[in-house]
């Protein structure tokens, strides 16, 4: 009997480890490995890291987890096709992996603008099953769907929900920055009419945006207002992590000018250009007691001018105008160290340099404005007709970039070398679905192009740049261009003003010189508020060449004014009570 019992005990000892092993294996199949649980956490490595792990891992379940992590990060890196490829390889997923895969798929749908699909995918996910990290991703997708629908307030509300589940400081900062960007891109009237409905965090964000907008052009008051806001909302997420865009305001100092160096070509073939810009600059500063030292860049090298300016104690420069001189500064930024510089041109080499901004009358501004205007006018399949030269290529690139931002697709671009090419370019570029055409051409070419378009499709919406605006356009010509819209500087809105009549006489009604005068005028407006312009996000200046704001690399961006030919006259759009011609 004893021997039988002993044998039984020995059998139990033998089988117990085997039973435990099978039990644990069953748990792994049901719940996933301990590594699978990492899907519930943030993915902090790069996609390259997870891809290397995929190549190194032998365990099938861990391999699936690494593919999910790689796909998740690839989505955040905007590498959607690669992410989808990894998702397509997944097989035999456990419940935790299926749950995470569902989140990634919903995120991809939202990024692609498939809002209904993304919403349906989210509806299949039970929030109670998600970890805090996964819940933050869930609400990020909700926010993206709202953004796709241009519903910024709903996107902001989702971001607030998202913040509740973020523990990483960097992610919290990124979320605050995105929330602030949404607020800044929301119409002030919408912000003012939004009810926080007792949500203290939303109330704090709305108040912050309203105070910022109300005090944007009063920097000293703006800084004090932000401090007051912090005291009123001490526990707000933005009080702890102020949006990055606002953090620089703490060191803001108002612009004070005593001496300014103006660098222009004032002799040789470019003398007229330089003198016209100088006239505009001088007229703008006439009521300011600031000493201006003028340097002729045709007589001295840019290096000599900068050294001379430093010796004279000048710490603010306007210019140079010539591109080769701008490139000298871009390639040797130490030359302008400790100086404020407003270059009057930009080049393909332009880059971010401390205390340097680039200002010029670039075709890119008009092209971007045209893309936005056509989008707002419900044009969705535009044709862009441009000359086969530097102007045309720059215009086409800028329009396409803006169109990609608006619609996610490329614009249809057609180039022409000479007027004879235009007919072929139009017929080959137009399709039945084309609903608008943006044209870069001179005044005479524009009339020829419109004649062709009227024969092909007279219902097309037509847009042009300032290049086509000419003082030689008589009533008959203007009548022929009926309904065509074009962009130009706001200086042309009021042709009855004393300033306009003065400049019209000074330039002998030469539109190109009038543009240069307006540029010189605005150069003073910019340098006189240079710190405000550079350091206060959203700060704008209403100039003669447009509404001026600081873009990437401190490139001065211009919001253009749009005009329309109507019944033989030209009207600023939305101001049709006052004909300007």
UniProtKB/Swiss-Prot annotation:
InterPro entries: LpoA, Peripla_BP_I, TPR-like_helical_dom_sf
Lipidation (N-palmitoyl cysteine): 27
Pfam families tied to this protein: LppC (PF04348)
The entry's keywords: Cell outer membrane, Cell shape, Lipoprotein, Membrane, Palmitate, Peptidoglycan synthesis, Signal
Top-rank taxon: Bacteria
Listed GO biological process terms: peptidoglycan biosynthetic process; regulation of cell shape
Locations listed in the record: Cell outer membrane
Chief location bin: membrane
Membrane topology of the entry: Lipid-anchor
Lipid-substituted positions (S-diacylglycerol cysteine): 27
MF (Gene Ontology): enzyme regulator activity
Subunit organization: Interacts with PBP1a.
Reported function: Regulator of peptidoglycan synthesis that is essential for the function of penicillin-binding protein 1A (PBP1a).
Similarity field: Belongs to the LpoA family.
Protein name, per record: Penicillin-binding protein activator LpoA
Organism expressing this protein natively: Histophilus somni (strain 129Pt)
Organismal lineage: Bacteria, Pseudomonadati, Pseudomonadota, Gammaproteobacteria, Pasteurellales
């Amino acid at each position: 009997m004893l021997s039988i019992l002993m044998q039984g005990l020995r059998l139990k000892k033998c089988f117990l480890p085997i039973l435990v092993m099978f039990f644990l294996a069953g748990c792994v199949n049901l719940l996933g490995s301990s590594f699978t649980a990492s899907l519930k956490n943030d993915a902090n490595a790069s996609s390259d890291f997870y891809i290397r792990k995929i190549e190194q891992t032998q365990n099938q379940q861990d391999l699936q987890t690494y593919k999910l992590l790689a796909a998740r990060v690839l989505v955040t890196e905007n590498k959607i096709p690669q992410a989808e490829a990894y998702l397509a390889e997944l097989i035999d997923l456990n419940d935790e992996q299926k749950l995470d895969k569902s989140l990634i798929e919903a995120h991809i749908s939202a990024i692609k603008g498939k809002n209904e699909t993304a919403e349906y995918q989210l509806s299949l996910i039970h929030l109670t099953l998600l970890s805090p990290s996964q819940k933050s991703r869930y609400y990020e997708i909700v926010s993206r769907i709202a953004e796709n629908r241009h519903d910024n307030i709903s996107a902001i509300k989702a971001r607030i929900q998202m913040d509740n589940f973020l523990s990483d400081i960097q992610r919290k900062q990124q979320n605050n920055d995105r929330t602030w960007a949404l607020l800044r891109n929301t119409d002030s009237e919408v912000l003012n009419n939004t009810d926080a409905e007792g949500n203290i965090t939303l109330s704090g964000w709305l108040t912050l945006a309203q105070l910022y907008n109300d005090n944007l052009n009063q920097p000293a008051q703006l800084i004090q207002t932000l401090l007051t806001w912090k005291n009123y909302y001490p526990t707000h997420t933005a009080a702890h992590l102020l949006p990055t865009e606002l953090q620089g305001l703490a060191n803001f100092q108002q612009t004070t000018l005593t001496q300014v160096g103006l660098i222009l070509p004032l002799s040789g073939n470019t003398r007229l250009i330089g003198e016209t810009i100088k006239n505009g600059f001088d007229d703008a500063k006439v009521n300011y007691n600031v000493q201006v030292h003028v340097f002729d860049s045709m007589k001295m090298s840019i290096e000599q001018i900068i050294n001379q300016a430093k010796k004279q104690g000048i710490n603010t420069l306007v210019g140079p105008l010539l591109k080769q001189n701008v490139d000298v500064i871009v390639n040797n930024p130490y030359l302008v160290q400790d100086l404020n510089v407003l270059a009057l041109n930009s080049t393909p080499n332009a880059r971010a340099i401390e205390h340097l901004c680039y200002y010029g009358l670039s075709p890119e501004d008009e092209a971007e404005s045209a893309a936005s205007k056509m989008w707002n006018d419900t044009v969705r399949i535009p044709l862009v007709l441009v000359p086969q030269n530097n102007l045309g290529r720059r215009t086409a690139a800028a329009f396409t970039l803006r169109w990609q931002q608006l619609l996610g697709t490329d614009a249809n671009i057609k180039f022409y070398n000479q007027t004879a090419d235009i007919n072929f370019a139009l017929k080959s570029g137009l399709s039945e679905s084309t609903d608008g055409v943006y044209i870069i051409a001179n005044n005479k070419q524009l009339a020829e192009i419109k004649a062709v378009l009227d024969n092909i499709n007279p219902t097309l919406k037509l847009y042009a740049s300032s290049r086509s605006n000419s003082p030689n356009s008589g009533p008959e010509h203007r009548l022929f261009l009926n309904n065509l819209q074009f962009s130009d500087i706001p200086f042309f809105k009021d042709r009855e003003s004393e300033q306009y009549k003065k400049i019209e006489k000074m330039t002998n009604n030469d539109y190109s010189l009038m543009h240069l005068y307006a540029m010189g005028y605005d150069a003073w407006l910019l340098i006189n508020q240079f710190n405000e312009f550079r350091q206060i996000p959203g700060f704008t200046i209403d100039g003669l060449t447009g509404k001026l704001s600081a873009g990437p690399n401190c490139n001065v961006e211009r919001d253009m004014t749009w005009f329309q030919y109507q019944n033989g006259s030209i009207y600023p759009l939305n101001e049709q009570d006052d004909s300007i011609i």
